[in-house]
């Protein structure tokens, strides 16, 4: 099946659907497995000359269906799987280690290829120990208070630039040097994948143990639930952040349209949890319990905020994290102002008496 054939008679749509169906119905498949299936069912050419192009096609379709990466075209040879990197993409080093992987891995399971690019599907840092309220490690949990960890403070205190992306792997990717935070702009996709067990689950690892942990199916589900919950933490549970959202949101170049679920997560004070597949809002979150997969990323920005201090009067007025400091400042300001006014009145009355005398 050549390029011209793909554009005729809905051939591409059939191939697109065939890939989604095959990877959903089979575990630990490779790109070569998918190519073999397409050659049998979609009458794709079975020659060595077309194998490289067919591998790249399958790699691209998997990226589009999972939204974990954007495939790059015509940037290197056909012996390399390449992902697209935007000109303004912040390379924090937490997600992508490289944007190219050899096609020699085409006969390996998807999760092996994905791990070659970096940490696109994160897994919990300590998967052998499940966090619970009775855990002895509870004292070391990092707390996340929506009043202290939110988009409003990120912008006003750290002057962070929020970058809306259509790459799920980049969600909560924070570059400290450029102070750029990437947020996934399509939360509805996470809901759809959780309900349909879609293509993203084909990247699940089947290895029981590994020195380099890779996400299994349950951890992929947890990852997407945490993506949804993170919008509540950063926006929905903090009044100034809810008001800030419509001013800072910008649709991505490819989508050009706002995800309908995004303003619901970011601008509603309360959400009926039965409608969405994630836990209820909490007054305080703990990274180990509520964000076991994304804990490293979310702790990074929370610690940045915790260590930051207002550097101007304007920032001081907006920073209410330290309630004692905030109200002490206002009380001192009020009493100081009253003292200045009384002193000024005393001078005025003294001047009046002097004139009258």
Residue ranges and their predicted role:
Residues 320-357:
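C-terminal single-pass membrane-anchor helix
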Residues 1-327:
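Non-transmembrane
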